[in-house]
Design a protein with these regions (language model features):
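Structural detector for internal amphipathic alpha-helices that build alpha-solenoid repeat scaffolds
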Residues: 2-21, 31-54, 65, 75-89, ...
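Amphipathic alpha-helical scaffolding segments comprising HEAT/armadillo-like alpha-solenoid repeats
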Residues: 19-32, 53-68, 89-103, 125-137
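Structural signature of alpha-solenoid helical repeat scaffolds
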Residues: 36, 68-72, 104-108, 137, ...
């Protein structure tokens, strides 16, 4: 019995049997990204980040929306910030820079803010330099945080 061989491959499968992220349907991933189970959420965000890295603007846009949806969940925000590094768009840079201003540094938030800075460090310099320089010159941040902003600009 040949099963579904007459039906052919789905349009998002390549001839080599690989998934073409530029054609993969996104609906099920969007639902998974708001799943209460952390493992499901994380898997969806990683896939959205991969899709954004191959030019799927809608995947990056959804990640931006998740920043607001999970605004008080640092564990999930860390995953979202990590994946936004794969969305080289001005909106991603602006959202990550805004997170640094929104979330005050403390022992509880330090890990998340460090993740935001690591994501900013891999985005194209022309998207982040002026924002990071402005943060580095802002005396409302501690000298330690300002040094981190300068170090990120220098990368």
């Amino acid at each position: 019995m040949k099963g579904n061989s007459k039906l052919g491959s789905p349009p998002w499968m390549t001839a080599e049997g690989m998934v073409d992220l530029t054609k993969l349907p996104i609906d099920f991933i969007l639902k998974q990204a708001i799943d209460p189970e952390y493992k499901e959420f994380r898997s969806a965000c990683v896939l959205l980040g991969s899709m954004a890295s191959v030019g799927r603007l809608e995947a990056g846009l959804y990640l931006l929306g998740l920043l607001g949806w999970y605004a008080s969940d640092l564990q999930r925000l860390e995953v979202i910030a990590e994946q936004l590094a794969h969305s080289p768009h001005g909106s991603s840079a602006n959202a990550l820079l805004a997170e640094i201003r929104r979330v005050r540094s403390s022992n509880t938030t330090r890990r998340y803010l460090d993740r935001v800075l690591r994501s900013l460090a891999v985005l194209p310099p022309h998207l982040v330099e002026s924002g990071l320089e402005a943060l580095a010159e802002d005396t409302s941040f501690s000298p330690k945080m300002r040094a981190k902003f300068f170090a990120t600009v220098a990368r």
